[in-house]
Design a protein with these regions (language model features):
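Hydrophobic transmembrane alpha-helical segments in integral membrane proteins
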Residues: 1-18
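Internal transmembrane alpha-helix with an interfacial aromatic "cap," most often the third helix
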Residues: 21-25, 51-64, 70-104, 117, ...
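Membrane-helix boundary elements
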Residues: 108-133, 152-155
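Aromatic-anchored segments of alpha-helical transmembrane domains
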Residues: 44-48, 109-119, 170-181
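Non-cytosolic membrane-interface motifs at loop->transmembrane helix junctions
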Residues: 3-6, 62-74, 126-138, 186-196
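Membrane-interface helix-boundary motifs at transmembrane edges
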Residues: 25-36, 91-102, 127-129, 153-164, ...
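Alpha-helical transmembrane segments in multipass membrane proteins, preferentially the mid-helix core
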Residues: 17-26, 84-90, 115-120, 139-163, ...
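A generic, lipid-embedded transmembrane alpha helix
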Residues: 39-56
Length: 217
């Protein structure tokens, strides 16, 4: 029964992300609109690489270890890209001047994160990488996320639509960290990925709301 529930939820999430992403991209007449569309598609399509093999693994009698591992690798990279887009969406939305230190930090952390994800020690293809390497590759990602959370937090009163954006990003990381640290020894912690995904859906809804408000003006 758990498999059916998870599969239905994952399909709904992917459809929401891809459909709204296409909508935002099609309706995006300014830079921010296009950035929100691309970010949403990167999120949805990136997650599909590990969610689709996981769904198939529930119902097809075959070994999906390698596809699941490759999917997790791709998702790790696309999630990093998503937060790069979140930085540029922040810049466009709040009309802030370029802060070179923050910009360089975001890009440097993203490059380090992706480089760590590509290390053979991750053993993506056999799905038996250590918890230690999992924690190490996520350190720059969490720092990157903390910067994005801070930026949206300090500007939360400047935009009614995005006022809760920092909360959704913060919660997504709070649900994600226990999975990285303890899911290999306590599989039940993997259930935290469900509320993490709900946070992503809420972020996508804010993008959609922002675009709807712009079109109404």
């Amino acid at each position: 029964m758990k498999e059916y529930g998870e599969t239905i939820f994952d399909i709904c999430y992917l459809l929401i992300a891809i459909v709204i992403g296409i909508y935002l991209l099609a309706k995006g007449k300014n830079k921010q609109g296009k950035l929100m569309g691309i970010a949403t598609l990167v999120l949805g399509l990136g997650d599909s690489f590990h969610l689709v093999p996981r769904m198939l693994d529930y119902f097809v009698d075959a070994d999906f270890t390698a596809p699941l591992g490759i999917g997790k690798l791709i998702t790790s990279i696309t999630m990093t890209m998503f937060y790069i887009f979140m930085y540029y969406i922040y810049k466009e939305n709040y009309k802030v001047e370029d802060n070179k230190i923050i910009k360089i930090s975001i890009w440097l952390l993203a490059v380090i994160r992706i480089a760590l994800c590509l290390l053979p020690q991750n053993k993506w293809f056999t799905n038996d990488g250590s918890v230690t390497i999992g924690i190490i590759r996520n350190i720059p990602f969490v720092i990157m996320g903390a910067i994005i959370i801070y930026l949206y937090f300090i500007n939360r009163r400047k935009d009614k639509t995005f006022k809760n954006m920092w909360i959704y990003i913060l919660l997504s990381f709070l649900f994600y960290i226990p999975v990285v640290v303890g899911a290999s020894s306590i599989p039940m912690l993997g259930m935290f990925m469900l509320p993490k995904t709900i946070c992503y859906i809420l972020i996508i809804v804010l993008f959609k709301k922002k675009k709807t408000n712009e079109l109404a003006d």
